[in-house]
Amino acid sequence: MAGTDPRNRELSLMDKQISSLLEICLNSNLYSINLHCNQISKIEGLRHLCYLQHLDLSSNLITKIEGLDSLASLQSLNLSCNKLTRVEGLEKLFNLKKLNLSYNSIQDLTGLIPLHGWNHKLSHLYLHSNCINSIDEVLQSTVGLNCLLHLTLEQNAKGNPVCHALGYREIILENLPQLNSLDGLDRSGDPVTAHEVDSMDLANLDFLEYLITFDSGRKEVKESLTGPVKTARIDEVLTKYRKHRDSSEAINLNTDGTSSSEHDVVRFQDNSNMLREMRIKKLEDQISELLVKASCPKSEQTKLKAKRDTDITTESDSESTKENRKGSTTKRTPGCHKTSQTSKQQANQQLKGRTSYSELKQNVSRKQSLSKRKTDIETSLSSGRTDTDSTGQILGKPHAIGGSLKKKGELVRNSIEESTYRALVQELDQERERRWKAEQVVLKLTENIKELQSQAKEEKGINSMAVYTTDRIKELLLKEKNAKSKLQELIHHLREENEKLMDELKKLKCKEEDYQKAYKSMEDTLAKLETQNIQKQALEMKQVQETERKVSASQREIDLLRVALRQQKEKVNQLHEVLTSKEQLHRKELESRVALNGPEFQYALAQEMAKEEHHHSQQIHSFQEKINLLTQQYADLEDEFRAALIIEAERFKEVKDGFDNVASELAEHKETVHRCRQKEKQSATLMQELTTMVKEQKARIAEITKAKQEIISDLKSKIHSLEKVAEEGRQKTVQTELLKKEKSKLISQLTAQESLIDGLKAERKIWGQELTQQGVSLAQDRGRLEAKIEVLSNEIESLKKQNERDADALRIKTKIVDDQTETIRKLKEGLQERDERIRKLREENIELEKVLQEQSDERTAQLEELKQKLERQTERKEEVKQLLEEKEAELEDVKKAYSAMNKKWQDKAELLSHLETQVRQMKENFDAKENKLIEERDKSLQCQKVITEKLRSVDDAFRRQLESVLSAHQAELIKLASDKQKEIEAANERVYQVEEEMRHLLKETANSKKIMEEKIKRLTGALSDIQKEF
């Protein structure tokens, strides 16, 4: 169990307000434990975790390192952010590779001395932010750590008092040749990568591969800025469990599109600042020397200068004079031009670096001082700029001739000095311009940094949400893993119990064989005793014959025999009493004992057998019903999966049909493209976003169970953007409404799929509950079987006791026979002695034969009585033999019963093996069905991938067709527009011609009207004249 399933051996209880390790039920098969940010004050209850490799107890209240002696497999130990004052209790951690004791109050490192040598494997040691004072103690405790590669006593400006000692780094690197890096820097001073130093930080996070780094947002930020931005990755932050992170992120911006590390930038800035300061000092020295030189000849002129000449020139005047005289200064001062070029290069390099707030203050102060110096220099220059006319007016007429000669010499000198001053002032102006540009760049950079920090905070919030979701998903997976592990433990426990029962059966069989061997040995001893008894009877007959022959030998021998007979009579009486008492006891026992062949015992056995058979048949029937139910449920699940696949295929077809409908609608609306080009562009962007949404949703359907909340957040953001675009599109076109309807359909499909997934999860939970019920029923059956086993074991013990009693009776009988044999031996010895005595007394007996003949009759009668007694004893022996035969018959009956019990046990063992085979078959069938389902799921995923690829290809082809159609349509529109313009022009010309014709016609009609009116007037006049004449 310990090595089969390593995924079920992780425990994460971060920030659960745990105050003691004894509150947690820790499985002995755990691989890693994370108890970060709790209230644990003592390390205890970890002795049984022999497989533990990663232990995180950071951010707790631990004051002493203890209770870790039994963790032989521990590889990484994190005790940072606790209340430790010394290192101890690490002697038996032979496999420890990484030890983090940072952010404590450690002063004593002597606990690292037992880790010296090649037996321990400590390679990473973190001791930053502690109270270590002496280098000697550090060297003493770390010299013998032969595997130590990375030692950190200072990190992120949080170190120990030792780090401030002179030559601290050189001393430690000289005395510890095994070190590769000290405080995150290798022996050459280069920073060590996080992969080399923190290669073991990802011990218990299994689900970080499902977290998405937000690169798209960063790309937008990079495009908005002048250069790329580097931020700390989310995965590296998660590996450090979000503790003791640096508040400042490494953000490097470049104006030319290239970025460098912060370390190089800081060095370069220091070098450039030093060069600038040296250059400014040289310029100040040159200006001071020139001022000192110019002070002597100018002291006379300053008295005679007018106030209007001593006014300070403005920046615009100085700049104009600089521009007018730039050519002369460049010719005279090539060195200054070189310095200006170098200063430009330095300014460009300065723009590549990152400036801090303190540097900005220094630059501002320097600029103020330079501006003051510049104004002083300009005042001096303006004071030196005097015209010949003004000087002539001030000096007056009497000194005009002598002063003119002096002025010429002074003007020559002043021109040289002014040229040098102007060059220096130009350099200062250039420096000022560069500083001003740098300030503007710094302001832009600070604004960009603020924006990036706000974005980083938002990303941190999103990452925290992602971590929370991963924690919840991990907890759910751990619960499922624990449930699976519990079921496996139950199965393993049942197997162990079955093995124990099999072992007990084997032991019982061995005991049976031992009993059979003992029974055979008893039979052999009984046969030997019977042969010995037969031999003894033959010897007794011989002795009786010898006694009959020798009775007439001597009366003394008869007296002795009488005494012996009396003694034997007493012994026989005692034996008779003992035998009668034992016979009575044995009869009582037989009366109280139930006969194995009796009807009552057989009736009880038959009832119990019938009950057990009925119960066994019921169990088999219940198991078959459960199997049928499980098969039906599995078939129902398969049908549901198939129905879900069919529904998904139908929905995919519906989406495709909707997509085709949209394409047809777009083809229908091509006629109105010339009126709403901008609207079509917006709709095209919306279509692209919707197609990307569809692709993302289809690609993430398989990953919904792992990253559901992330997908929902993305969907919400995209839905908000789509809603904004849709609000604009509602006012402009009807097409956006159709797209919104399709979007709502897609959302409803997603909700339906989520409901299906929830239903599948509920069915999975029901399935787990049914499995638990089956486990409970199996446990109940196991309890019943254990009760039956206990009853049968009690019966076996009673039978054993009966066997022991029978064996005791047999032992008693054998002891009686042994006593009889001892008496016979004693008689034999006495007879031998008597034979010797008889031999001695034969002579005496011959003399007394005559006297004893009369007494011989009486003695013969006594001998007859003795013979009768011997016959009775023989009859008693025969009765004892019959009893032995009966006991043998009883033993045979016991053997038969024992064989029947063995058969029953074998039948039960066969039943158990049959049940085991059925359980294995069920498990194999279940595993096969699971594999089939997994294969079907993989096939469906592959089909989905193929379909998505086809959709993408179709989408690309459709886009190409759309682009080609749009281009053709645009060309046609252009042609139509040109044709229509031509037609409009022709129509306008025709209209103009028609208007002219109409105007001409109107003029002609007007003329004709006038002519007609004149004719009518003439006619009326003529008619009136005719009437007058008549």
From Swiss-Prot:
PROSITE patterns: LRR (PS51450). InterPro entries: Leu-rich_rpt, Leu-rich_rpt_4, Leu-rich_rpt_typical-subtyp, LRR_dom_sf. Residues 160-200 form the LRRCT domain. Its main location: cytoplasm. Residues 300-311 have a biased composition (Basic and acidic residues). LRR repeats lie at residues 7-28, 29-50, 51-72, 73-94, 95-116, 121-142. It is found in: Cytoplasm, Cytoskeleton, Microtubule organizing center, Centrosome, Centriole. GO terms for cellular component: centriole; centrosome; cytoplasm. Residues 432-645 form a coiled coil. The keyword Cytoplasm applies. Residues 298-401 are annotated as: Disordered. Keywords: Cell cycle, Cell division, Coiled coil, Cytoplasm, Cytoskeleton, Leucine-rich repeat, Mitosis, Repeat. Required for the organization of the mitotic spindle. Maintains the structural integrity of centrosomes during mitosis. This is Leucine-rich repeat and coiled-coil domain-containing protein 1. It comes from Xenopus laevis.
